[in-house]
Amino acid sequence: SSLKFENFLIMPPAYYKYGDEEVINFYSKIIESIPECKIVLYNFEKLCGYRFSVECVQKLVERFPGQIVGVKDSSYNLFENLKLDNFSVMPGSESKLLKGLELGCSGIITATCNVTSQLARKVYDDFLAGNDQTVNQKLCDIRNIFEKYNLISGLHTFYSTKDQFYKNVLPPLNTLNRS
């Protein structure tokens, strides 16, 4: 690309109803435009209205093995069943990290790891080393607190206690009321 970006996390187009073929065509156009790209698919039906199937992901990886390199699974329908060589599967929540690792996932991609990264890293490292899991429950508890609210508003509220900059949000987002 002219801007030298080559690695992307890309969600399918939102709003309109479409099927696997339209989604495959969408990613095909991107790859044709930027053949050197590496794409992590973003599976988040709640946000875009489309949920990847195992079959669709398999077709994309077969067609573009050098470009479609992983999936962030925030719909949680892939991380237990999708197994492909040289392909990373990453659930979108800390609460799925340990189970995901046990099933062969590569890790997680999650907004709240901005807060939980040290705990998530310990769970990951302890899993790889075969150590007892001493912080996984705490990690999941923190994630569960954020899930009670709008996640992004919760993150801004958390960070605004240290830096007023994080109070700057645009509607419909806002910081959480402390009461």
Residues of each region from the PLM?
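Short beta-strands and strand-loop turn motifs
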Residues: N7-P12, C37-F44
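Conserved short secondary-structure transition element at the edge of the structured enzyme core
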Residues: L101-E102, K138-N174
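Short, small-residue-enriched loops and turns at beta-alpha junctions
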Residues: A14-G19, E45-R51, N174-T175
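Helix-coil boundary/capping segments in enzymes
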Residues: S1-K4, V89
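Alpha-helix N-cap and loop-to-helix initiation/capping positions
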Residues: Y18-F26, F52, C56
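Aromatic/hydrophobic pocket-lining residues that form the small-molecule binding cavity
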Residues: S1, V23, Y27, A120
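Catalytic alpha/beta core domains of metabolic enzymes, predominantly
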Residues: I31-C37, F44-Y149
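Glycine-rich, proline-tolerant flexible connector loops at the mouths of alpha/beta enzymes
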Residues: S1, I10-E22
